[in-house]
Amino acid sequence: MRLWLPVLLVLIAASAANAQDSSPPPRPSPDFLFGRPDGTLGIRTSWLTGRAGSDWYDFVTDQLTLEKKNFNGPTVGTDLGITLTPRVDLMIGFDYNQRTRASEYRDFVDNNRLPIEQTTLLREANISGGVKVALTERGREVGRLAWVPRTVVPFVGAGGGAMWFQVRQFGDFVDYVDLSVFTDVFESKGWAPSAHVFGGVDVRVLRRAYVTFDARYIWASGNLGPDWVDFDPIDLSGLRISAGINFIISEVR
């Protein structure tokens, strides 16, 4: 009897350990939300292809070693979406970009036969508001509380805003009256109204997050001021191709 008692205790302990090891795994988090989202908050990066359709671009690309494509570049932005209806969001956005390019005169050199060099900076910051319309239902209600988001939701939208811009050239320049070389800074900055249209798709990747791809065309132009006499307003329009991530905002329910 004394020999069987330790063996029995070992068997009981082993059975208890096996029972713990075979306990069911924890349940995964639910794949639904408690009610419709109240909005979204997102960040994105874009590639801007400027239209460069005004005479200022014609002048600097003709006289300097610049091309219109030199004014294309990356943009960063953020968006806040506020849900108005099951398919419509009010969008508030901010975009910023800056391009700095070095150049020299194509047809002139200085007295030492060295390049006449300068730097051109173009900076834009756009504050916008608009409406985003989903082309399909963004989700479905299950019961009284649960809401299941769709995986893919295409959308379109439009809006307007205000764009702050700065154009700055600094370095050495040629006086076309006597062909002398001088050092100077030319600058213009201000605000201009803007308008835009856009379309894209939201792709759900997490319970509360979407990856967003969109294309947006923006119209804007700004007066250059006295440093560029007799020039038309500078063209600030262009196409932005964007990718970003949006996080769902909802009240605690």
What residue ranges belong to the model's regions?
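Outer-envelope beta-barrel architecture signal
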Residues: L33-L41, P74, P86-V88, R123-A125, ...
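Gram-negative (and chloroplast) outer-membrane scaffold detector with strong preference
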Residues: T45-W47, G81-V174, I241-E251
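Extracellular/periplasm-exposed beta-strand and loop segments of Gram-negative cell-envelope proteins
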Residues: G50-F71, Y96-I127, M163-A192, A220-G238
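Internal, hydrophobic beta-strand segments that form the core of beta-sheet-rich folds
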Residues: D214-Y217
